[in-house]
Each structure stands twice: as C-alpha cells, then as structure tokens.
C-alpha cells in the first residue's frame, strides 16, 4: 500500500466552550478521480483535480469560508457559515476540518448533526448523512479544453460549500461534526 499525505493547518487558539465554534471535518473532494458529474463552471465537462494541483493549492484553502444555500442544492458565497483551518490529502481524499459558526447558524449545525435536511420545507432523514461538500476555485488551468473530462492542473481554492451529496460533483464527499 502506497499512502501519500500532504497536510497544512492554521493554529486557532483553544477556547473551551466557545459558543460560536463547532468543529467539523469531512471530505471536500477526491484527487486524480473523475467527478461524478460536471461541476458549475466546467461548461458541462466532468473534471479531474490532479494531485499535484491539489497539493500546490492546499495553502489557499486555509482561512477560506464554508458556505451553504438554504436548499443545500448549490453554492452561495454570500452565506458564510464557517472557516476552514486544516486541509490534507490522504490517499485520494482531500480532507478538511475547521469550525462552523454554531451560535450564528444553530439550525445548520443541527441539520449536520442529525442527518436531517429541510430542503423544500419537508424534513427527511436518510440512513447516510445526505450532506457533502464541494470546492470553489478560481484561476483554474485545464490541460486540454477539448478533452471529454477536463484535467485541472492548477487551481486556487476560494472556499467550499456544504450541499446535498446528490448535488455535488463528487458524491463521495461528506461532512460531520467532531
């Protein structure tokens, strides 16, 4: 077994019982793996985030915001509900951790904790938490724009979003409270 690991973090001072810091962790995306469906901005192309591009871009994730939309079906960069403090690539998974703003968004924390989503007004629970994550990028370079599946060779992460796994480009993403 060949395990590759790249990791970065920013140190947040420990504040026991802080009401607005709820630790989270999860998988943002998979590297060197084609997306399950085309992400927004890819002109209908599925994408592969190369390991090299992801490793080089890890520093750009730190301190970036985690956002959501009320229906958990898209990104909404104006609804920032948390901050990313650590990012690492373990195997093919780009793992994140950080803090949700729990006092400001208690309903989101509760939905992640319970696995219940209220999209469309009707609460429903699934056996597996239905929420995942999706990355937000800028300055992307594509190896060959004529390719059926775009290979991203350079990116700058500008944040991430919590959304329903069935709406994410990579369905094997997830988020949970620590």
List the model feature ranges, each with a label.
Residues 60-75, 133:
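Short conserved beta-strand and strand-loop elements enriched in small hydrophobics
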Residues 29-40, 55-56, 72-77, 103-110, ...:
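Short, surface-exposed beta-strand/loop "edge" segments at domain boundaries and coil↔beta transitions
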Residues 24, 56-57, 69-70, 90-94, ...:
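Domain-core detector
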Residues 7-17, 73-89, 141:
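Short amphipathic beta-strand and strand-loop transition segments with alternating hydrophobic
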Residues 22-26, 64-66, 94, 133, ...:
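A broad, low-specificity signal marking well-ordered, structured residues that form hydrophobic/aromatic
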Residues 1-65:
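Polar/acidic, low-complexity leader/linker segments enriched in S/T/G and N/D
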Residues 88-178:
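Residue microenvironments linked to proteolytic maturation
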Residues 45-57, 83-88, 114-118:
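Short low-complexity stretches enriched in small and charged residues
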């Amino acid at each position: 077994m060949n395990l590759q690991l790249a990791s970065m973090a920013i140190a947040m001072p420990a504040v026991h019982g802080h009401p607005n810091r709820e630790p989270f962790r999860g998988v943002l995306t998979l590297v060197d793996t084609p997306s399950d469906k085309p992400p927004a901005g890819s002109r209908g192309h599925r994408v592969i985030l190369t390991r090299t591009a992801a490793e080089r871009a890890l520093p750009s994730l730190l301190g970036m915001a985690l956002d959501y939309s009320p229906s958990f079906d898209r990104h909404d960069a104006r609804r920032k509900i948390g901050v990313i403090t650590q990012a690492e690539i373990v195997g093919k998974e780009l793992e994140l951790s950080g803090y949700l703003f729990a006092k400001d968004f208690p309903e989101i924390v509760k939905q992640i904790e319970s696995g219940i989503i209220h999209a469309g007004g009707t609460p429903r629970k699934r056996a597996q938490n239905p929420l995942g994550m999706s990355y937000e990028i800028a300055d992307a370079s594509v190896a060959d724009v004529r390719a059926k599946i775009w290979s991203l060779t350079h990116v700058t992460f500008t944040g991430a979003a919590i959304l329903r796994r069935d709406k994410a480009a990579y369905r094997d993403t997830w988020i949970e409270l620590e």
